[in-house]
Each structure stands twice: as structure tokens, then as C-alpha cells.
């Protein structure tokens, strides 16, 4: 396993991605990736890769993106990946690590049961309304 740290800038990240070794690339960014034109997805494209999926119907984990670069999967992790609680990133990583190909149908299937247990510091919407 190789860990590379770069500034949160498209070109620096793209350069590191081009040089990445291994069979899988995992990206953890300094801020939430909220759209396809954010730094991390742009860096994947600048390195010659593509983004196959942005977002997923699982919370926590909905800000994940999945791409590919030179035949390697690239997973852009949302902030919830730092939590020990089960989240959508766990579902994606476990499938990719096992060689399962994910497509739009695969992600749609994750929507069933996609609201995972919330962490205490971020109550579920129904708890907020009980106030």
C-alpha cells in the first residue's frame, strides 16, 4: 500500500493519480466532494480517467464517487469513511475489493435499506422534528 499526500489542487492530485501503483486507488479529500466539477473528480479526469458514478442513494455515504483510471477503480470517499459506523463507502469498497463490477443498477439496489444508522451527533430527520 502506498499513501500519497498532495495539496487539494487538481493538477497536483492528477499527477499523483498518474503515478499511483496498485490495483485500486482510494481518494480522501480535504473537503466534501459535492459535484462533478470539484477538485477530486476533475483530477481523475485530468489524469486521463473518467467518473462512472457520482453520488449514491445511501446515507451516510451519498457523496462518494466511483471512477476508473488505466483500468483501476478509483473511489472518492466521502467524510463518513472516517467513522467506524457502517456507511455507503463500506458497501462500495467491499464490492470493488471482491472484484464485483458496479453499475447504475447496483447503486439503485443499495437504495433499499440505504438510510443507515445515524451517528449521535447528527440525528435523523424524524428525530429533529420531535424536537
Residue ranges and their predicted role:
Residues 126-131:
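Acidic, Ser/Thr-rich low-complexity intrinsically disordered segments
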Residues 1-125:
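Short glycine/threonine-rich loop/turn motifs
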Amino acid at each position: 500500500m502506498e499513501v500519497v499526500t498532495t495539496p487539494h489542487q487538481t493538477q497536483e492530485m492528477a499527477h499523483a493519480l498518474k503515478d499511483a501503483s496498485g490495483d485500486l486507488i482510494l481518494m480522501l479529500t480535504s473537503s466534501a466532494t459535492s459535484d462533478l466539477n470539484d477538485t477530486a473528480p476533475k483530477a481523475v479526469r485530468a489524469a486521463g480517467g473518467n467518473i462512472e458514478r457520482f453520488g449514491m442513494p445511501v446515507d451516510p455515504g451519498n457523496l462518494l464517487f466511483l471512477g476508473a483510471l488505466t483500468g483501476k477503480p478509483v473511489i472518492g470517499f466521502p467524510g463518513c469513511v472516517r467513522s467506524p459506523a457502517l456507511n455507503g463507502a463500506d458497501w462500495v469498497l467491499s464490492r470493488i475489493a471482491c472484484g464485483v463490477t458496479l453499475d447504475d443498477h447496483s447503486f439503485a439496489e443499495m437504495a433499499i435499506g440505504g438510510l443507515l444508522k445515524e451517528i449521535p451527533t447528527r440525528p435523523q430527520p424524524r428525530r429533529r422534528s420531535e424536537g
